[in-house]
Amino acid sequence: MLVDSHCHLEYEGLVDEQEAVLDRARGLGVRAFLNISTKQAEWAQVVGTAQKTADVYASVGIHPHHADEHSELERADLLAAAKGGKVIGIGETGLDYYYDHSDREAQKHLFRLHIDVARELQLPVIIHTRDAEDDTLAILEDEMGKGAFPALIHCFTASADFGQQVLDLGLSISISGIVTFKNARDLQEFAKAIPQDRLLVETDSPFLAPVPHRGKTCEPGFVHDTATFLADLRGESLDSLAEYTTRNFYALFSKAVP
C-alpha cells in the first residue's frame, strides 16, 4: 500500500472527477492522500474534501507564488486553520526564485511565518524550493536554532549537496514523477542515496505525470509508477519501498491515523 503525500485534488483536471480519480488510485493500492493548499482561498475546499473523505488529509498554507497576495495574512488565521480537523501539515510554503512570481522578501516572511506556526503545533512544514537553495537552507538553519520542527522538502529536484544538508537538519524528502524522466540523472543518483527512513513519494498531481503517462493529467494513482521506478532504481522491491514510505508518512504526519 502506498500514500500520495502531495496532490492538489481541487485543481483543474482532478476536481471535476475527484471521486473517480481517487477510486482509480485506490485500485492501484494507494491508501491515503494528502490534499495540499496553495492559497488561503482554497483552505475551506481543501479541508472540506478531507473531512468528507476518510482517506484524504489536508494541509493549509501559502505557496511562494502567492506570497504577494497574502501580505496581510495573520499568524492567528494560519494557526486557527491548522488546528482544524484532518489538517496534518503546514504548506506548501517556501521559496521560488525560478519564476519570482512574488517579491523574495515576501516569500521569506511567509516561509518563516509557516515555520513558526508549525513549530507551535508540531505539524510538518511542506517545503517548496526552486532555485533558492542558499536562502532556503539559511532560513531552515536559523529557524531550527529557535526550536525544532518537523519538515519535508516536497518534489525534490535540488542539488545533492542541498539534499544532504537538509537531511543533516533532520528533514525528510519526497520524490515525485520527475525521477522517472530520462533527463533526471542527477536526481536519480541522489534518490538512490536517501535513507529509507527519510523517503516519501508523491505525485504533485495534476502536474508532473511520470513515465509512462507523460503528457497526461497526473493523477494520485500514478504514485504507483513513481514508486515502481524508484524501487527498481534503489534495488529494492516495490513492496518494501511501499511499506517504509507509508510508514514514514505516518511517522512524519503524526496527526494522520493509519
Feature map (PLM): residue ranges:
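Mid-domain alpha/beta scaffold segments of enzyme catalytic cores
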Residues: M1-P258
